[in-house]
Amino acid sequence: MLLEAPVYKEIFGAVKIYELQKVIKLDTETEDVPVYTITNIPREKIYDTLGKMAVIVPMKNEKLHLVDGVLKAIPHKCPIIIVSNSKREGPNRYRLEVDLVRHFYNLTNSKIIMVHQRDPGLAKAFQKVGYTDILDEKGNIRSGKGEGMLIGILLAKAIGAEYVGFVDADNYIPGAVNEYVKDYAAGFLMSESDYTMVRLHWRHKPKVTKGTLYFKKWGRVSEITNHYLNMLISEQTSFETTIMVTGNAGEHAMTMKLAEIMPFSTNYSIEPYEIVYLLERFGKWENVEEFKDVFDQGIEIFQIETLNPHFHEDKGQEHVREMILLSLATIYHSKMASKNLKRRILNDLIEHGILKEGEEPPKLRIMRPINEIDIEEWMKVVENNSETLLRFGL
């Protein structure tokens, strides 16, 4: 794969954020690249990395033909982890998903783990290991997106994955999913740190407008979130920046070493919260001894622009409003946010009709990192008590 080389980066303490890199060629046999501004990632190394990466597919009541396309596009070497929060009654959509996955496995022999997010056996496992952050007041697992991602990471850790990547289940272009996973691998191969994140920026996000496709460069939520994330960073450095272009990158990946020390927020604030947390905790040289290895190696964040457009299910304006509110709540409640920045966020939310005068963005629920969970004990309880856990080829 040929990509623009990671020439420019901004450094905040132990955190390095690289400027957006474009994919130049997805597959190549070129060995010597004469231009220093181009990076060549050998195909063999990409495929070797794919075998160490679990791809997590969170889903909730998605169209089955979209799910089918996404699963078929994930490179065969990657174990697939499906965490579904779909209906189990009236109708039982989860059963339909299970049937689809069984058929997919019979055709492909792919390595798959599948579980329902609200499985009581999962909740029991979390209670057993003393991790109640993911549970509601009744002892059940909450229904948020972040909770599903956290479950996926634990399952990936249980099978020994070194990397975890996330892809949405509602993508209309299966070939895009195939590229996303290979882009993750390329990002990891460019890194010199065990603590690495790769975040994807879509080249275009098509919309149907007046009966034709319009290839929009930015989504509304992304524009707003990136603007305020860059303002947050600029206030800390006193230098204006536009470095962050992947604030809401649902398609992103991490090394397991980074994933297991990350706290996670719930619902749709999870992707911007990852950036805010890393800047808060590792953006200054404070309490270094707690994470000595992280500070020694540094955290590298790569942002890659895909060749493929991202065309996914339109979930409506209410979904967009919720994403904007929760994304900006992450920045608003950051300990780095100044009074001026908070005021600008409030004014923006009121202007868009998302908040009323006198209201504030909600405070986020944060789940602790998973690094203290006894993964063997957790997995043993899941296997012995789960109603929905399925393993194919693993």
UniProtKB/Swiss-Prot annotation:
Main location as per UniProt: cytoplasm
Annotated GO MF terms: mannosyl-3-phosphoglycerate synthase activity
Functional note: Transfers a mannosyl group from GDP-mannose to phosphoglycerate to form mannosyl-3-phosphoglycerate (MPG).
Pathway involvement of the protein, from the record: Carbohydrate biosynthesis; 2-(alpha-D-mannosyl)-D-glycerate biosynthesis; 2-(alpha-D-mannosyl)-D-glycerate from GDP-alpha-D-mannose (MPG route): step 1/2
EC identifiers of the protein: 2.4.1.217
Reaction(s) this enzyme catalyzes, per UniProt: (2R)-3-phosphoglycerate + GDP-alpha-D-mannose = 2-O-(alpha-D-mannosyl)-3-phosphoglycerate + GDP + H(+)
A GO BP entry: mannosylglycerate biosynthetic process
Cellular component terms per the entry's GO annotation: cytoplasm
Keyword Aminoacyl-tRNA synthetase: no
Organism: Pyrococcus furiosus (strain ATCC 43587 / DSM 3638 / JCM 8422 / Vc1)
Cellular location(s): Cytoplasm
Domain of life: Archaea
Protein name per the record: Mannosyl-3-phosphoglycerate synthase
Keywords of the record: Cytoplasm, Glycosyltransferase, Transferase
Family assignment from sequence similarity: Belongs to the glycosyltransferase 2 family.
